[in-house]
């Protein structure tokens, strides 16, 4: 977490009339969750608590996001933009961020973003790990055990390869979707995620 004094000195407070626009982004999915404002005190409280604290322009007071709902925004990282007049905060949200109950205040657009969909699918798959096997195919798959899940990944991998060899694009898309889904289940079964895979890809890219 950045030092308050150092960060505070960088901010162009006069330029923003002492109310700094703050963009909140999901640290895992990169989904934009909401926009709020901070004054000097709200920024300090945020850094002290590790949770996002805004200045409410309507209530004219500080308010910690989630103080009533429990849907806190836990700060992972933050950065000023190139003009030092907007702050980006990467956060781990506890529950939905929007007061309407949606995950994001920009739900109409964000839910259609490809990587956001994958991240939400991953969360849904994880939520089915301990569910009744009669409630969904995913829960039944988890109940069948690692060997069966791995077998399904192998089967879908072969079917994906076959679809590619016969140059059937539509079938390739369908089989690749099945493969990605079953791979997601296999990763979840091992308490891993696509983030772990991406980290390995990044590591190899640097080499």
From Swiss-Prot:
It catalyses: 1-(5-phospho-beta-D-ribosyl)-ATP + H2O = 1-(5-phospho-beta-D-ribosyl)-5'-AMP + diphosphate + H(+); 1-(5-phospho-beta-D-ribosyl)-5'-AMP + H2O = 1-(5-phospho-beta-D-ribosyl)-5-[(5-phospho-beta-D-ribosylamino)methylideneamino]imidazole-4-carboxamide. Its EC number is 3.5.4.19, 3.6.1.31. The keyword Plastid does not apply. Residues 1-117 are annotated as: Phosphoribosyl-AMP cyclohydrolase. It is an enzyme of class 3 (hydrolase). It is found in: Cytoplasm. Keywords: Amino-acid biosynthesis, ATP-binding, Cytoplasm, Histidine biosynthesis, Hydrolase, Multifunctional enzyme, Nucleotide-binding. It holds the Pfam family PRA-CH. Pathway: Amino-acid biosynthesis; L-histidine biosynthesis; L-histidine from 5-phospho-alpha-D-ribose 1-diphosphate: step 2/9; Amino-acid biosynthesis; L-histidine biosynthesis; L-histidine from 5-phospho-alpha-D-ribose 1-diphosphate: step 3/9. In the N-terminal section; belongs to the PRA-CH family. In the C-terminal section; belongs to the PRA-PH family. This is Histidine biosynthesis bifunctional protein HisIE. It comes from Campylobacter jejuni subsp. jejuni serotype O:2 (strain ATCC 700819 / NCTC 11168). The gene is hisI.
């Amino acid at each position: 977490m950045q030092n308050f004094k150092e960060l505070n000195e960088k901010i162009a407070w006069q330029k923003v009339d002492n109310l700094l626009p703050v963009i909140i982004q999901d640290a895992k999915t990169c989904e934009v969750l909401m926009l709020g404002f901070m004054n000097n005190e709200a920024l300090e409280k945020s850094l002290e608590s590790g949770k996002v604290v805004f200045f409410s322009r309507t209530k004219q007071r500080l308010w910690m996001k989630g103080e009533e709902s429990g849907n806190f925004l836990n700060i992972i990282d933050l950065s000023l933009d190139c003009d030092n007049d907007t702050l980006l905060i990467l956060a781990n949200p506890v529950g939905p961020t929007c007061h309407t109950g949606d995950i994001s205040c920009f739900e109409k657009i964000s839910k259609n973003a490809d990587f956001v969909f994958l991240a939400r699918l991953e969360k849904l798959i994880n939520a089915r790990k301990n569910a009744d096997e009669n409630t969904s195919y995913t829960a039944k798959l988890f109940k069948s055990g690692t060997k069966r899940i791995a077998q399904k990944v192998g089967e879908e991998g072969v079917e994906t390869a076959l679809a590619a060899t016969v140059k059937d694009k539509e079938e390739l898309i369908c089989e690749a979707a099945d493969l990605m889904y079953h791979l997601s289940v296999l990763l979840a079964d091992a308490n891993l995620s696509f983030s772990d895979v991406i980290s390995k890809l990044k590591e190899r890219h640097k080499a």
